[in-house]
Amino acid sequence: MGHCYSRNISTVDDDDEIPSATAQLPHRSHQNHHQTSSSSSIPQSPATSEVNPYNISPFQSPLPAGVAPSPARTPGRKFKWPFPPPSPAKPIMAALRRRRGTAPHPRDGPIPEDSEAGGSGGGIGERLDKNFGFAKNFEGKYELGREVGRGHFGHTCWAKAKKGKIKGQTVAVKIISKSKMTSALSIEDVRREVKLLKALSGHSHMVKFYDVFEDSDNVFVVMELCEGGELLDSILARGGRYPEAEAKRILVQILSATAFFHLQGVVHRDLKPENFLFTSKNEDAVLKVIDFGLSDYARFDQRLNDVVGSAYYVAPEVLHRSYSTEADIWSIGVISYILLCGSRPFYGRTESAIFRCVLRANPNFDDLPWPSISPIAKDFVKRLLNKDHRKRMTAAQALAHPWLRDENPGLLLDFSIYKLVKSYIRASPFRRAALKSLSKAIPEEELVFLKAQFMLLEPEDGGLHLHNFTTALTRYATDAMIESRLPDILNMMQPLAHKKLDFEEFCAASVSVYQLEALEEWEQIATVAFEHFESEGSRAISVQELAEEMSLGPNAYPLLKDWIRSLDGKLNFLGYAKFLHGVTVRSSSSRPMR
């Protein structure tokens, strides 16, 4: 499932100078959790260079064998620490050990007590319940064939249905060994994966779920057979990268699936080229996302904190142990970067080195082939790979990006709109006035997206009421959305039951200050917004009142004084910009919009 484990390598120090020795790159490992991949030989890229002897990470390179990634792709910066730095890989390795139920590495000292070694359930002397309540008659319904893939918990086989609605149809059967389920976490992962596959199966870019069975030794998950191989194999077959036009077609499919399961309150947590399969070997084959073994529910009012995923694709906030659906967007940004240039945006010789690059280094957009790639494509990738998760586009916003617009990707409801509107109606009148001024300075490209979202909510008489938000969410609801409790946000939007949002106020409620700050024209946007605020919404405000607006204490008074003009007691430009950015939304118990 996740692959953030590491090898014990004592001979290479991350901060040492690189010697000039050479060695063979490791072969690309086919550890597909679902289907087989093409085994045809990969053509040699014309842009080959000396073989990199330090590609010793177990995470497989997206480059063809013999192609060394340029050190300039991720600058080889020297991170100087007064003491040896803590390894960012340790939390991931520890989390995966807990899920798999495996013991930690041997250490000096006494043998740990049972409670210490047992992880999260399933310790010594504790009997795990591995009965899932699934049907038992797998062999009566399916004829099992050859193995087509293998992963940590089990393997995937070709099979043929002997009876039922899909009689005679070939399917893929993921066989998960119960002997590998040695912790309560690993058992819960399997249960949740099956639940998610059932709930999300209807989308055109989600692998279809057919059935699930079990016996005393295994769980059998019956799914659609995708015979076109992994996206990673397709990248390799093209010499390491996709032409821009083809990359767009791939990314639209990835984002379409992601926008769908994000709307259901699901975060995948392991998006990478190996977890996307083509339905056939045809050029126009549909791409489908697989492997929800590490996925979880992302409730609107909570952040996840367990560190899982694959090293090259893990988001900075995952390493900081506070993340949600935005972490998947980062992973798609890494995939986008690889598709367009054939190199990883972050590279290291060990997992710890990779994670330090993820946290500190910036992707390189100057070396070849980036000068030949369109500026709008680079803007797209940069807006996915923003280290501040609040400034990243959502999957629905990415589908509306100008670079993808000619692909006619269609639009899905963006749940971030609900969170922003909820915050708006719970904000103070002064905060709402500031946002209304900002909405009048929104660039045309951003207005296109907001207009589309407004229409998806099906306004009546030019405005939106609470029931418009309720109906729209119900239209897209699956069992996964119910499990993630996303509809609970509607209880916090009750003030809309007695008020209508027209499009102008909807824009004020739905605009993300952080995402606007990520735009190159942010200073111009803020200047125009401040002019509107000066003429329409500004008023005199005391330091104490401003501190209360921003949930700050008396210690902040000296700082806030610089934000208020002494002449008339109103916010100056700096104060307005900081006020928009700061912690301004009151708690859910604050007074609703009047």
Curated annotation (Swiss-Prot):
Activated by calcium and calmodulin. Autophosphorylation may play an important role in the regulation of the kinase activity. The modification Phosphoserine is found at S310, S352. Disulfide bonds: none annotated. It is a lipid-anchor. Residues 1-126 are annotated as: Disordered. Residues 142-404 form the Protein kinase domain. It catalyses: L-seryl-[protein] + ATP = O-phospho-L-seryl-[protein] + ADP + H(+); L-threonyl-[protein] + ATP = O-phospho-L-threonyl-[protein] + ADP + H(+). It is found in: Membrane. Residues 445-480, 481-516, 517-556, 557-586 form the EF-hand domain. Autophosphorylated. It holds the Pfam family Pkinase. SMART domains: S_TKc. Residues 34-49 have a biased composition (Low complexity). Residues 427-447 are annotated as: Calmodulin binding (CaMBD). Its EC number is 2.7.11.1. Ca(2+) 1 binds at D461. One of its GO terms (cellular component) is membrane. Residues 50-60 have a biased composition (Polar residues). A lipid is attached at G2 (N-myristoyl glycine). The active site is at D270 (proton acceptor). Belongs to the protein kinase superfamily. Ser/Thr protein kinase family. CDPK subfamily. May play a role in signal transduction pathways that involve calcium as a second messenger. This is CDPK-related kinase 6.
